[in-house]
Amino acid sequence: MREVMTKSMARNIFYGGSLFFILIFLGLSAHSHRYITQTSTDAATLTDSVRHGKHLWEINGCINCHTILGEGAYFAPELGNVMTRWGVNDSPDDAFEMLKAWMQSMPTGIEGRRQMPNFDLTDEEFRAISDFLLWTDSIRNQDWPPTDAG
């Protein structure tokens, strides 16, 4: 065996190693995509109302204060499991009523509590956001958040 590495040996090791890790990366990317689309996301329940609720979530900047499954700001509570915490995850009508009542009667002046803005949402928008939060609550997320309180 030679003690000196030639340029061609170094080049072959570099290209071979690069190709190996590129193939590993592509395989893991394909696996992640397949897992997300086929296992973790329930696309069958992704209705127009859920999509509209996600759109409202984005345009109203809810993520600037709240988190969903750990993504977002930590200024206000996690909402990924809010329907389970409220006990309304089995009833879309109860979820709608609970969300609407909560957002319309935000308590003010409580020490240590931040005030949520009033968004002047219509019933259709409340329904869409509650459907989005119900859908988010149904995601198989490997027990995230780690506590029931979010």
Q: Which residues are covered by each model-predicted region?
A:
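Local sequence-structure signature of Cys/Sec-based thiol-disulfide redox active-site neighborhoods
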Residues: K54-N60
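Extracytoplasmic electron-transfer domains, predominantly the class I c-type cytochrome c fold
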Residues: T47-D48, H55, L69-A73, N81-D143
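Short cysteine clusters
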Residues: C62-C65
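Short N-terminal secondary-structure initiator segments
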Residues: S18, G53-K54
